[in-house]
Amino acid sequence: VTTGLRERKKLATRRALHEAALRLVAERGLDAVSVDDIADRANVSPRTFFNYFSGKDDAVLGLDPDTSPRQVAAFLARPRDETPVQALRAVARAQAAEMATDTELWPLRLKVIDSHPALLARLAAVFGEGERVLAAAVAERTGTRAGADAYPTLLAGVAGVAMRTALHRWFAGDFTAALPDLLDEAWDLLSAGLPAPPR
């Protein structure tokens, strides 16, 4: 089996497990769904489930451990003549565009998260860890120190807030707006120094 085929099979299995978990929780609620239920719906063994996710919450959220490394690599690969803000904004916009192509699962994911505070807490923890990893990449690109200097942590945090704001607005607007455009609006406001809205 070629590496490419093996990777595609792994991605397909991960997606099948995520989709099964998400749909089951949407139907029954988080507490009424077990790992066995998810594995059964996805036609895999519970043992296989744990090769992909540490538990049902992570399966429902579809957490992919490669997301942060991919973002960091994309950020560090951006042209050096871009400012760190421009580079991070471009990476975030590409991510939003990719998310928006999943017109079925992303809206369902956000609806399920909205109904289950435990999932929201888990997602917040994942976002926090992602921002720490991103701050280290910003520090590497700018010659600053993550944790000691404000810039890398602040820029990574601002990127996270911009994405969360866009996702909240996408959800509140029943997914009718374009997610990348909502993200652009957030970055535009931040870049302008958050001027007060006209009365």
For each predicted feature, which ranges?
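Amphipathic alpha-helical packing segments from all-alpha helical-bundle domains
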Residues: P117-T142, A150-G157, T165
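Hydrophobic/aromatic residues within well-ordered alpha-helical segments
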Residues: T13, T67, A92, V126-G130, ...
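Hydrophobic alpha-helical connector segments
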Residues: P69-R109
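Amphipathic alpha-helical segments enriched in hydrophobic/aromatic and basic residues
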Residues: V25, S34-V35, K56-T67, V85-L88, ...
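Hydrophobic/aromatic-rich alpha-helical bundle segments in the mid-to-C-terminal region
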Residues: R141-W187
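Basic, helix-initiating cap at the start of DNA-binding domains
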Residues: V1-R28, A32-R41
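HTH DNA-binding helix-turn interface
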Residues: G4, R28-L30, N43, F50-L61
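Append "Primarily bacterial transcriptional regulators
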Residues: D37-D40, F49, L88
